[in-house]
Amino acid sequence: MTKLIIHLVSDSSVQTVKHAANSALAQFTSIKQKLYHWPMIRNLELLNEVLSKIESKHGIVLYTIADQELRKALTKFCYELKIPCISVIGKIIKEMSVFSGIEIEKEQNYNYKFDKTYFDTLNAIDYAIRHDDGQMINELSESDIILIGPSRTSKTPTSVFLAYNGLKAANIPYVYNCPFPDFIEKNIDQLVVGLVINPNRLIEIREARLNLLQINENKSYTDFNIVQRECIEVRKICNQRNWPVIDVSTRSIEETAALIMRIYYNRKNKYHK
């Protein structure tokens, strides 16, 4: 099997480059992949260390570096090695500059901008943590989104992912034979989304969870009929109230969150900024 080596170089956390690389790699499932992460490369000394690693492990280089001197050094080095060197956002920045008529700033300020978006994100993360798994249900009116679904349908990580995008998300588990809280219907301003999953897949996930915790007594947790009933009931609850339902069986957390955000902003007639 072919192996593809990719070096992710950034003057920040490499998340932007990583997302771009993963999106592209999703189109090449038949090859082995090896990603090398090189974050916080902000001077020539650090860059030279990375260049030596690239020289020993030839592969595609993806980068986001604002400093012009560092960019030139990196691209020149890769050119001499005859390996691809791709700026992930360079084309975007250039087109923005051309379209707006605004010159690209030559100096990069590495001080993080603590603006409203930053603090909104912190507040949303705090909210997601405090309102995880049905906690503090008396504060649901403060949420933007409420997720409901059986246990292990990725409600918690989805809530956190939404929080990183500035949305306050609470999540409430649905448990078989337990009455669903009536108060949730009073929160008419919130988007309520049901998460369901293929019962067989959910049983696999729950069994893995029980094995990890070394628990062998909770048989109802992995009983097919009960698991299937939980998913059916969540669909029923949502359909009766015109709440959207998302099947997460084959979706990543990022995909689920992205779909929820699309529903949220369409519902609120907003655009994500």
UniProtKB/Swiss-Prot annotation:
Its EC number is 2.7.11.32, 2.7.4.27. GO terms for molecular function: ADP binding; ATP binding; phosphotransferase activity, phosphate group as acceptor; protein serine/threonine kinase activity. It catalyses: N(tele)-phospho-L-histidyl/L-threonyl-[pyruvate, phosphate dikinase] + ADP = N(tele)-phospho-L-histidyl/O-phospho-L-threonyl-[pyruvate, phosphate dikinase] + AMP + H(+); N(tele)-phospho-L-histidyl/O-phospho-L-threonyl-[pyruvate, phosphate dikinase] + phosphate + H(+) = N(tele)-phospho-L-histidyl/L-threonyl-[pyruvate, phosphate dikinase] + diphosphate. Keywords: Kinase, Nucleotide-binding, Serine/threonine-protein kinase, Transferase. The keyword Secreted does not apply. HAMAP family: PDRP. Bifunctional serine/threonine kinase and phosphorylase involved in the regulation of the pyruvate, phosphate dikinase (PPDK) by catalyzing its phosphorylation/dephosphorylation. This is Putative pyruvate, phosphate dikinase regulatory protein. It comes from Rickettsia typhi (strain ATCC VR-144 / Wilmington).
